[in-house]
Curated annotation (Swiss-Prot):
The gene is LOX1.7. Residues 163-861 form the Lipoxygenase domain. This is Probable linoleate 9S-lipoxygenase 7. GO terms for biological process: fatty acid biosynthetic process; lipid oxidation; oxylipin biosynthetic process. One of its GO terms (molecular function) is oxidoreductase activity, acting on single donors with incorporation of molecular oxygen, incorporation of two atoms of oxygen. Expressed in tubers. Detected in sprouts and flowers. but not in leaves or stems.
Amino acid sequence: MIGQITSGLFGGHDDSKKVKGTVVMMNKNVLDFTDLAGSLTGKIFDVLGQKVSFQLISSVQGDPTNGLQGKHSNPAYLENSLFTLTPLTAGSETAFGVTFDWNEEFGVPGAFIIKNMHINEFFLKSLTLEDVPNHGKVHFVCNSWVYPSLNYKSDRIFFANQPYLPSETPELLRKYRENELLTLRGDGTGKREAWDRIYDYDIYNDLGNPDQGKENVRTTLGGSAEYPYPRRGRTGRPPTRTDPKSESRIPLILSLDIYVPRDERFGHLKMSDFLTYALKSIVQFILPELHALFDGTPNEFDSFEDVLRLYEGRDQLPQGPLFKALTAAIPLEMIRELLRTDGEGILRFPTPLVIKDSKTAWRTDEEFAREMLAGVNPIIISRLQEFPPKSKLDPEAYGNQNSTITAEHIEDKLDGLTVDEAMNNNKLFILNHHDVIIPYLRRINTTITKTYASRTLLFLQDNGSLKPLAIELSLPHPDGDQFGVTSKVYTPSDQGVESSIWQLAKAYVAVNDTGVHQLISHWLNTHAVIEPFVIATNRQLSVLHPIHKLLYPHFRDTMNINASARQILVNAGGVLESTVFQSKFAMEMSAVVYKDWVFPDQALPADLVKRGVAVEDSSSPHGVRLLIEDYPYAVDGLEIWSAIKSWVTDYCSFYYGSDEEILKDNELQAWWKELREVGHGDKKNEPWWPEMKTPQELIDSCTTIIWIASALHAAVNFGQYPYAGYLPNRPTVSRRFMPEPGTPDYEELKRNPDKAFLKTITAQLQTLLGVSLVEILSRHTTDEIYLGQRESPEWTKDKEPLAAFDRFGKKLTDIEKQIIQRNGDNILTNRSGPVNAPYTLLFPTSEGGLTGKGIPNSVSI
């Protein structure tokens, strides 16, 4: 034992004893692969032992010289390492001994202070006191980076895992609790540094770069009635030179260094996987482009066989000096991942699920409709409740935007029913992208995009599947918006050129749906709206607060992935602008859609009822009855929703038994006030916000937060590669309008419909970029933590919540079995469809990689 053990702590008391503890730490790393100079492994810890001190804080014995605060023990220091928990490489965990003096008066420690006098930071995972007399084991869950003490303005403090409501906090810990929250809030000034732990808000004024010219200017989102938006994390970077209201951007090469509070950054395994997947995608992206240089039609796929070559046949590794130089520059861990032998080669994209069983089934009408219920964007379809469909756009600004679909277009496909009869029998549904797209369509079509706003009507057949009836494609009126639109209606056909036109009509719908999915269903409704909850929770709820402990796992990595997205995905000229049809108007469009965002409607039952695909029914298991019984997303989702709500109800009910306890919780009230007035401040005056006056309002709100962060995000994210990895199925852009009779394009459509289709949808370069992106986003990292799991089994000391969490996990296991059973039921045709792709996006658990299943706790990718 080489650590220094101090004595004489208690001023001459002879009843002092030794309390032994175990500290688990992880060494520093830079790119989360190698940083031997900063490593805190092996012999370096022999020196470090004297440079990391721990002081316990009593929760029962006060310090008369320190006001109403708990007494500190004398410093104790790290001793020799006990064991290494993982292989001794960058990112490994090592356990160390530490010994404290203790006596009866000191009682149970409620917190400890750590001081790092070393030159490098390290990751502190936990401290466990093995046997505090009369109290047993005391566990401190830390999971935090500790920088050298000179970087901090106040002590680093960690609390034991016993939760307390503010009013129940031991008096001697109260000041520490309050001061820690003040530290995390900061003062709203200055540029944030890597070691900062400050959570603060800002508007989206960092998407553009006006210093690089007008084409790189982007609208500021948030802080205005015209473009409202959820708040993001503040970085404090200086303004641009040309626009003092725009925040400057960091160089692309430094993208990984964009500020988020240090403990919000990806862990070492997550960063390793993330960078590896990105490198694989870059290689997969570049090689076909090199081949295209020698192609007669560069940047075009000439046939579907050309597209399929992305996934087949290019496994042979290249040789020569270029490849050797590339591999020499890549860290060892990445090379192992890149060259692994699990069937995914570096030089080809994995075969997407939608074409794994059949190369052509994706083109069927049944699959086109099924993906509205079980694909990557199953949250848009709604029941048709008026015919013809009417627009909600202001007629003074946009003229007549109502649908031109008539009964004559569809009544021959309604199994003998009239339109009114079909509507009254809940048989008619609509995929409606018209009102979202029309206000921007004139501007969008001035770019390379040439597309329409679409409405698709569908009929619910007796076998439970949906049948497309008609597609309406609309353009802004050439004489001006006030004159409405020009529209054309297309109906199904399987004969001649009309069949090819119908396939193109479905492609235009898919372009609409893909853009709406990526910007609204995915980015806005999960990533963007959840970030204010992350910030407010850390600013207003102490780590001691039970609700902080409830929600904390559902915020893991969200600020990091969102910051990365602002840097390289949703920024001006970023990957998203380069791949979706909305182009440079994408984020601005999402701000307009946010005007209609309603927090209580994000609850799954409320969403289903609002879209008319379910009705309230107290006799149904989840309080609603589905009008499409075989609706995989809704069926599985309601099971998950119910499990989450039961867990949250059990948990919250343990701490709050009355309205009064909710109202007197000053941290809880400050949290909810800040969420409404700052985090989602552009909607602070909306009447629908829960008032947070009752336990039920807390339960409902926390259930919705967890649902958004976990299951909703899983449903709209991890199916991206399985369905959109094959771009003809979900094209992101259309480059020319529907061919008109008598034109060369129409003749080409008759002569070579496949080539005409491919020349209409996403070009080769955009396809490769888009497929590379969705492959990265669809992968689970190897350190993912799924719904029903926790990073530490010691996350709380309270036994009843631990038992409730165990029940939650068992319920999720039961749901997995039910999903497997439903997917094996041949009567439920929408579960797998013509492409034979079983619906598993709400299957709770998964292994790492491209699995098409698994619900991570948080918006983590």
